[in-house]
């Protein structure tokens, strides 16, 4: 009987220790998530109301991003610490769908010159065209949405015949856990 008791003690972990280890592991995980959230909040500078949320799925179906929450309006801008990444395109039960910026065809501003997002290139850079005065656009100029959210910077300007296209380096949210949804109408 003593031998069986000793074997049981050796091969089993008392439930209190197991529970304590689970609580410690969960606490460590939550502390790391809290630090990530604080880092994100401290690295964004948005002069409007915004809601911080996290991505659930970064690329399901047709290049859409799924985020938590449904207290958003269609076309609310979604940003990470590096700039605009997309627009709210669908709001449902507990989640919302974000269309990546390269699929939005929105108007953008480069030095007060309007253009339109046409597509993305193989490196996920934006191609901006329909520019009215491309002579005033240079590499490293900043690009903003028509609502003044930073998008990225110009990395090249291509002029051929009457068509001018600008390549804009942008950010993605594939590696980012948190995003902010800007609420200008709230």
Question: At which residue positions do the language-model features occur?
Answer:
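Extracytoplasmic/periplasmic terminal helices and flexible tails
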Residues: 1-186
């Amino acid at each position: 009987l003593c031998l069986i008791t000793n074997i049981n003690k050796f091969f089993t972990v008392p439930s209190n220790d197991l529970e304590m280890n689970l609580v410690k592991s969960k606490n460590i995980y939550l502390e790391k998530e809290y630090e990530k959230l604080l880092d994100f909040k401290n690295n964004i500078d948005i002069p409007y109301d915004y809601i911080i949320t996290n991505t659930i799925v970064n690329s399901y179906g047709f290049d859409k991003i799924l985020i938590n929450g449904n207290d958003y309006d269609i076309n609310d801008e979604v940003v990470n610490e590096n700039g605009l990444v997309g627009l709210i395109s669908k709001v449902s039960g507990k989640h919302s769908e974000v269309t990546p910026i390269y699929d939005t065809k929105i108007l953008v501003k480069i030095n007060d010159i309007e253009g339109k997002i046409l597509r993305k290139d193989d490196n996920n850079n934006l191609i901006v065209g329909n520019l009215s005065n491309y002579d005033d656009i240079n590499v490293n100029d900043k690009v903003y949405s028509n609502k003044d959210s930073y998008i990225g910077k110009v990395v090249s300007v291509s002029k051929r015949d009457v068509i001018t296209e600008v390549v804009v380096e942008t950010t993605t949210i594939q590696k980012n856990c948190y995003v902010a949804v800007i609420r200008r109408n709230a």
